[in-house]
């Protein structure tokens, strides 16, 4: 079954256990680096979830920036020597400012983080730190939104098959493996295989 259909089923399953409170909305938080930054939710993602859940039942927030490591979102991150980088969690704070403004006064039925990132960490050789950071980011978001961690959905876009030989990005395959492992670790997590998108074509097929 294509990933798009599996993802659709996953999202429906996620919201099926959500709060049934009247007027409650389903919150989708889209973040990551370049591929997420270039993504235009209004072209496909938002129409799809609105069709499935109702136009007035969905809140979609996107905030992403190309070329960034995960430590610009996950605040406890430390490098292999135990040092803290200068830019730590600043993009997470920027994202959360948007999220809090969007949900102010709203009743929330479900929350799902849609994450497309990992290239920079693979390039820097930080793959061994990525599992803790990925799980930590999910937990950090759940805590800050006062949401049960086990109920917060997590859709992870896996790195494509761009550098399977680890020639330019020494931890490319390691980060891919970590993303798969994390996605398999919880029923509320889902992996999107992006290997078929590494064809050089734009969203217009050119």
Q: Which role does the model predict for each range below?
A:
Residues 6, 18-21:
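Serine/proline-rich low-complexity intrinsically disordered segments, especially terminal tails, linkers
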Residues 21-206:
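Cell-envelope and extracellular/periplasmic
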Residues 1-7:
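Bacterial N-terminal signal peptides that target proteins for export
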Residues 11-19:
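Hydrophobic h-region of N-terminal signal peptides that target proteins for export
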């Amino acid at each position: 079954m294509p990933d798009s259909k599996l993802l659709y089923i996953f999202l429906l399953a996620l919201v099926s256990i959500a709060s049934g409170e009247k007027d409650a909305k389903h919150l989708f938080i889209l973040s990551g680096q370049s591929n997420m930054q270039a993504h235009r939710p209004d072209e496909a993602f938002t129409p799809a979830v609105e069709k499935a859940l109702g136009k007035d039942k969905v809140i979609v927030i996107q905030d992403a920036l190309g070329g960034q490591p995960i430590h610009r979102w996950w605040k406890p991150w430390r490098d292999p020597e135990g040092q803290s980088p200068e830019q730590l969690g600043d993009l997470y704070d920027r994202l959360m400012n948007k999220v809090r403004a969007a949900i102010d006064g709203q009743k929330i039925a479900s929350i799902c983080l849609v994450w497309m990132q990992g290239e920079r960490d693979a390039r820097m050789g930080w793959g061994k730190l990525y599992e803790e950071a990925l799980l930590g980011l999910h937990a950090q978001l759940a805590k800050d939104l006062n949401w049960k961690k086990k109920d917060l959905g997590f859709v992870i876009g896996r790195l494509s098959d761009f550098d399977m030989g680890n020639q330019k990005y020494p931890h490319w395959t390691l980060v891919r493996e970590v993303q798969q492992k994390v996605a398999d670790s919880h029923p509320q997590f889902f992996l999107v295989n992006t290997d078929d998108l590494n064809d050089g074509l734009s969203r217009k097929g050119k």
